[in-house]
């Protein structure tokens, strides 16, 4: 792999994906492991490949990603966000393809905090009339 790369960060919930894009042939490594090993579920693999498929650049770049925090779904969406932003670093003209489908938008929804006197953020404790 060459030393020339484009870097971008993707986030979702508490997951952070640091993405490096190298010119290459389409291999994706996440935390040093192949995509298929790190995310065995096909649906998550599809989510990660979406920006590359949408821009028709699936076999043009090698991607190395360090991802931490969150769960598997949050991590997959953070990786998608990171790849989209890295592609934008390479070619700003891709914005017109990536922006309308929402790949560049940071999903800012976070877990709502638990309130005292309640069982969860909004759920009440079960009430027994008798």
Curated annotation (Swiss-Prot):
Pfam families: Ribosomal_S9 (PF00380). The keyword Ribosomal protein applies. InterPro entries: Ribosomal_Su5_D2-typ_SF, Ribosomal_uS9, Ribosomal_uS9_bac/plastid, Ribosomal_uS9_CS, Ribsml_uS5_D2-typ_fold_subgr. One of its GO terms (molecular function) is RNA binding. SUPFAM superfamilies: Ribosomal protein S5 domain 2-like. The keyword Nucleotidyltransferase does not apply. GO terms for biological process: translation. Signal peptide: none annotated. Keywords: Ribonucleoprotein, Ribosomal protein. GO terms for cellular component: cytoplasm; small ribosomal subunit. Belongs to the universal ribosomal protein uS9 family. This is Small ribosomal subunit protein uS9. It comes from Lawsonia intracellularis (strain PHE/MN1-00).
């Amino acid at each position: 792999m060459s030393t020339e790369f484009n870097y971008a960060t993707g986030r979702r919930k508490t997951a952070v994906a640091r993405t490096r894009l190298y010119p290459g042939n389409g291999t994706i490594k996440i935390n040093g492991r192949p995509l298929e090993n790190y995310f065995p579920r096909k649906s998550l693999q599809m989510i990660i490949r979406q920006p590359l498929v949408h821009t028709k650049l699936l076999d043009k770049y090698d991607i190395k990603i360090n991802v931490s925090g969150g769960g598997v779904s949050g991590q997959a969406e953070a990786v998608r966000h990171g790849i989209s932003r890295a592609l934008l670093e390479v070619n700003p003209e891709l914005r017109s393809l990536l922006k309308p489908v929402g790949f560049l938008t940071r999903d800012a929804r976070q877990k709502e905090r638990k309130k005292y006197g309640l069982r969860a953020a909004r759920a009440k404790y079960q009430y027994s009339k008798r």
